[in-house]
């Protein structure tokens, strides 16, 4: 694989996410998880998805640094990049792409100050909304950083001419405000 990420707690590895870059520029991201055969009892790693609810990638940082706020991004590659940019945050993500955010156990984030920084595309915004819905009754403070660019951009794409810390400081807003329904204009007609 071109990259591999480990999932589990600090003392128990439950699987890996493996990224294979294809010649056409696309990618395959495959889970390699610890499995138990219910018929034989045999245990081994297999090319199989994580059991649901799936664990978050970066979970160990939440447990090791309980006073640090949470930053939620999309994808392991982006999470690793975000950790370098925002070292005072516990950075977490989910596996399986934007459509899989609802298949994960978000309870480790409950009660924590959290910021969601979605990918700059429609699936990324939709995933951020789904995560916000999962957390809004469990976290006092949930903020969202609107994507600075809407072409699939994420924090792994930062270039020297863009300062993500300054942008986040200037642009972060309460997630409830970002996801509030647009104001509806009701036209009154004369009888």
Give the residues covered by each predicted segment.
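TOPRIM fold recognition
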Residues: 23-28, 44, 61-70, 76-182
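Short acidic, Pro/Gly- and aromatic-enriched capping/linker segments at domain boundaries
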Residues: 1-7
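Intein modules and their embedded homing endonuclease domains
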Residues: 7-78, 177-191
């Amino acid at each position: 694989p071109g990259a591999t990420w480990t999932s589990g707690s600090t003392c128990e590895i439950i699987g890996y996410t493996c990224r294979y870059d294809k010649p056409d520029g696309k990618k395959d991201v495959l889970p390699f998880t610890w499995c138990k055969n219910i018929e034989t009892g045999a245990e081994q790693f297999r090319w199989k998805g994580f059991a649901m609810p799936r664990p978050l990638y970066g979970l160990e940082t939440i447990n090791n640094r309980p006073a640090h706020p949470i930053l939620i991004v999309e994808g392991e590659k982006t999470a690793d990049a975000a950790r370098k940019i925002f070292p005072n945050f516990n950075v977490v993500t989910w596996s399986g792409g934007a459509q899989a955010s609802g298949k994960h156990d978000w309870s480790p984030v409950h009660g924590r100050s959290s910021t969601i920084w979605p990918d700059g595309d429609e699936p990324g915004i939709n995933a951020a909304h789904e995560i916000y819905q999962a957390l809004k009754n469990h976290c006092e403070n949930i903020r969202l950083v609107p994507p600075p660019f809407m072409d699939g951009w994420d924090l792994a794409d930062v270039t020297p001419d863009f300062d993500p810390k300054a942008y986040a400081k200037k642009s972060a807003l309460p997630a409830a405000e970002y996801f509030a329904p647009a104001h509806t204009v009701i036209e009154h007609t004369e009888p």
